[in-house]
Regions:
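Metabolite-binding pocket within alpha/beta catalytic cores that recognizes anionic/polar moieties
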Residues: 1-178
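Structural signal for hydrophobic packing residues in well-ordered secondary-structure cores
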Residues: 48-52, 92-95, 99, 190-194, ...
């Protein structure tokens, strides 16, 4: 029996668009690029051959158009896994729920989603300017723990090895990390020889959760030192960002394909940073557009 989605659960605006994004079902392409910064949406769309719609609501900006015959939607998510929860659920609803009847569609429509972002490198081989594909993500955010099917989707052995190594077992103050794979086919298509594949930590904040200490001391001053040295079955943690785990995890549970690729704009180990990255990230955008 198909599930009915009440008005309180699936909020549809009076114009037929989804609540936060303000996008209508017919405005969503099968191929989706996600960016954090609303200003980066225009940069991606500047490469489109045609443009059919442009919508802006809060931090969520959406443009749908075509690139070399491929219909693509680019959406800004803002910062953090909490926003990814909003964006992914609303994109999935646009794709797989009939807004007229409020029932799930008979034929589900899988999306291909690539997040293009920036990150902090954690290894000597990930200097500023490196493109890192998140083959696996470790979620510090705890978001996926609220959804059924979490254990079946995640790499539980990797999770336990990481928790044991960090000394976090039994620490009720920390959301239990989850480890999730990006879609392998999408990774193989996007992450070619010009990109590093690695394990990404999606942190729940920019400062303390990523080991940055300003006026408040860290609960674990050795956090980053331990993270940089962690290894499991040949995997090393390559970078910090704030969205990849929720994207890969929710996509897996919903039946979509998703991955994250980021440009390193700061290396925490080498202690270098580039604040003028906004021009150079265009090269990464072009690569994703060609391969998506």
């Amino acid at each position: 029996m198909k599930k009915y989605y009440a008005e309180s659960e699936l909020i549809i605006n009076s114009d037929g668009s989804i609540f936060h994004l303000h996008v209508k079902p017919e405005q969503l392409a099968d191929k989706v690029i996600l960016v954090g910064d609303p200003g980066r949406v225009a940069l991606v769309a500047s490469h489109f051959d045609t443009q059919e719609c442009e919508i802006e609501s809060r931090e969520f900006k959406t443009i749908t158009g075509t690139y070399k015959g491929k219909r693509i939607t680019v959406v800004s998510t803002g910062i953090g896994c909490d926003n990814i929860d909003i964006v992914m659920n609303e994109l999935d609803a646009l794709s797989n729920i009939d807004f007229g009847t409020r029932y799930e569609k008979d034929n589900l429509r899988p999306l291909q989603l690539v997040r293009i972002g920036t990150c902090g490198g954690l290894q000597p081989y990930t200097p500023v300017g490196t493109y890192i594909c998140s083959e696996k993500s470790i979620g510090f955010d705890g978001l996926l723990n609220f959804y059924a099917g979490r254990n079946e989707a995640c790499d539980l052995k990797f999770e336990q090895a990481f928790v044991d190594y960090m000394g976090w077992e039994g620490n009720v103050c920390i959301a239990h990390p989850y480890v999730i794979d990006a879609d392998k086919e999408l990774v193989n298509r996007i992450a070619q020889d010009d990109m590093v594949r690695g394990v990404t930590i999606a942190a729940g904040g920019f400062f303390g959760p990523q080991g940055r200490e300003l006026r408040i001391p860290l609960a674990d001053p050795r956090q980053n030192e331990k993270i940089e040295k962690f290894e499991y079955e040949g995997y090393r943690i390559t970078n910090f960002e704030m969205e990849s785990s929720a994207l890969a995890g929710l996509a897996r549970l919903m039946g979509h394909k998703a991955m994250t690729v980021c440009m390193v704009i700061a290396n925490r180990l080498i202690k270098e940073a580039d604040t003028g990255y906004k021009n150079s990230i265009d090269g990464l955008i072009k690569k994703v557009l060609e391969r998506l």
